[in-house]
Curated annotation (Swiss-Prot):
Periplasmic side: 36-202
EC number: 2.7.13.3
Subcellular location(s) of the protein: Cell inner membrane
Cytoplasmic topology ranges: 1-14, 224-465
Annotated PROSITE patterns: HIS_KIN
SMART domains: HATPase_c, HisKA
Species this chain originates from: Salmonella typhimurium (strain LT2 / SGSC1412 / ATCC 700720)
Protein name per UniProt: Sensor histidine kinase ZraS
GO cellular component: plasma membrane
Keywords assigned by UniProt, alphabetized: ATP-binding, Cell inner membrane, Cell membrane, Kinase, Membrane, Nucleotide-binding, Phosphoprotein, Stress response, Transferase, Transmembrane, Transmembrane helix, Two-component regulatory system, Zinc
NCBIfam families found in the cross-reference section: PRK10364.1
Main subcellular location of this protein, as a coarse class: membrane
InterPro entries: HATPase_C_sf (IPR036890), His_kinase_dom (IPR005467), HisK_dim/P_dom (IPR003661), HisK_dim/P_sf (IPR036097), Sensor-like_sf (IPR029151), Sig_transdc_His_kin-like_C (IPR004358)
Modified residues (Phosphohistidine): 256
């Protein structure tokens, strides 16, 4: 069953990683497709207008050519242009000379006026191929978007090779070449502008939806990772509590069985110490027996404290006062080892509900471990600050020898110690007290560069079971 459960957990882990990756790929592909398709509809509509403009220009050139062959005058060309300007979507037709002066126009009143200045005509640089640009023109008393198509007006192009000359056409100084003329046609681009706006709106909606899917996937992935991390922490806490319960039953029996003989051993050791001369070997052995009995009794007491839920006396406390008091308790020891204690009170720090004696015990354990890790000449820094609106953080940083990477995970395990004379229960008790407050404790360390213990405590504590 454990083998099957292991494979299920592994499959779920891989699936949780593959699904976001697959969604990222799909979102990327859809985004590329949407971006590539953007502008396709408006480009097709614009191409339709360009082709229509080309047909009308060629028709006007053809009509002009026929009229020239039949000796039609300029008035007939003007009439032809006015008739063609009645096509749906056409705003106006105009034929200008090289200086931008209107020769013929769909609006007869514009003939002889300047459509564009010579400098603007130079910038437009009309050639034999159609060109286009977006402009705003006045129509029916309002400004509308227009697509302006223009190129050189070449009514004589089809007559070359037939020995014919146009009548009524302007000539340049060189009589072999006609004066350059430019034909302009303006189409109503309102539908084109609406199509582009619709394309932009639809593209924006699709991209926003894809971005929302991507964001939802990222959030779901991080929430899943957070859930897995919380699940693992909960399982670890349950396993630790199960071990503590088992140890509690064992410790209760061991304490009862050990303490009674210890009391007898300690009493006999004191009896022999009083009956033997001071300085003698028997006297020293009796004192060693008494000290070892005290040490063993202390270990049993620490074990009982670890496995039994701590009874907290919660009250509103000022962390600045607790930290200052706990530092004063170790100041003499730190001063004798030339270790600096650094702490600056945070006057804006919220008061929290906690057991001041238990918190002092926690901090003392961390200070003493730091002093032991430093040895001589170092620094212990303590900082307290708020984390959001409902938690505070206490960090204890030392400049000691640090903790090896392979020891970090086991640092809070009962009976694990890096000290030759330690019991390995100090940090386990610290973790137990912090968790009873509803908080958490973590450690970071780089071997040779010290360690940082971080404690998270809720502002409003509720004793945990």
């Amino acid at each position: 069953m454990s083998f099957i459960r292991l494979h299920k957990d592994a499959a779920a882990t891989w699936l949780s990683r593959l699904l976001p990756a697959a969604i990222f790929i799909l979102v990327g592909l859809f985004s590329i497709m949407v971006i590539r398709d953007y502008g396709r509809e408006s480009a097709a509509a614009r191409q339709t207008l360009l082709e229509k403009g080309n047909v009308l220009i060629r028709a006007l050139e053809s009509g002009t050519r026929v009229g020239m062959g039949m000796r039609m005058h300029h008035a007939q060309q003007q009439t032809l242009l006015e008739e063609m300007a009645g096509q749906p979507g056409v705003l106006w037709f105009a034929v200008t000379d090289a200086q931008g002066v209107i020769i013929t126009h769909s609006n007869p009143g514009m003939v002889g006026k300047s459509l564009y200045s010579p400098s603007e005509m130079h910038q437009l640089n009309p050639g034999p191929q159609e060109r286009w640009r977006r402009v705003d023109v006045a129509a029916n008393g309002e400004t509308v978007p227009a697509l302006e198509i223009y190129r050189q007006f070449q009514p004589l192009f089809g007559m070359r090779g037939h020995g014919m000359r146009g009548h009524g056409m302007a000539r340049s100084a060189n009589d072999d070449e006609p004066a350059k003329q430019t034909i302009f046609i303006a189409f109503d681009a309102s539908e084109l502008a609406a199509t582009q706006a619709r394309e932009w709106r639809n593209t924006l909606i699709v991209l926003s939806a894809l971005a929302a899917v991507l964001l939802a996937t990222l959030l779901a992935f991080f929430w899943h990772q957070r859930y897995q991390r919380s699940h693992r922490e909960l399982l670890d806490a349950m396993k630790r509590k199960e071990k503590l319960v088992a140890m509690g039953h064992l410790a209760a029996g061991v304490a009862h069985e050990i303490r009674n003989p210890l009391s007898s051993i300690k009493g006999l050791a004191k009896y022999f110490a009083e009956r033997t001369p001071a300085g003698g070997e028997s006297h020293e052995l009796a004192q060693v027996m008494a000290k070892e009995a005290d040490r063993l009794n202390r270990v049993v007491s620490e074990l009982l404290e670890l496995v039994k839920p701590a009874h907290l006396t919660l009250q509103t406390v000022n962390l600045n006062d607790i930290i200052t008091h706990s530092l004063n308790l170790v100041s003499q020891d730190a001063q004798s080892r030339e270790i600096q204690l650094r702490f600056t009170a945070n006057e804006t720090l919220k008061r929290i509900q906690a057991d001041p004696d238990r918190l002092t015990q926690v901090l003392l354990n961390l200070y003493l471990n730091a002093i032991h890790a430093i040895g001589r000449q170092g620094t212990i820094s303590v900082e307290a600050k708020e984390s959001g609106t409902d938690r505070v953080i206490i960090t204890v940083t030392d400049s000691g020898k640090g903790i090896a990477p392979d020891q970090l995970e086991a640092i809070f395990t009962p009976y694990f110690t890096t000290k030759a004379d330690g019991t390995g229960l100090g940090l386990a008790v610290v973790q137990n007290i912090i968790e009873q407050h509803g908080g958490a404790i973590k450690v970071k360390s780089i071997e040779g560069k010290g360690a940082v213990f971080t404690i998270w405590l809720p502002v409003i504590a509720r004793q945990q079971d």
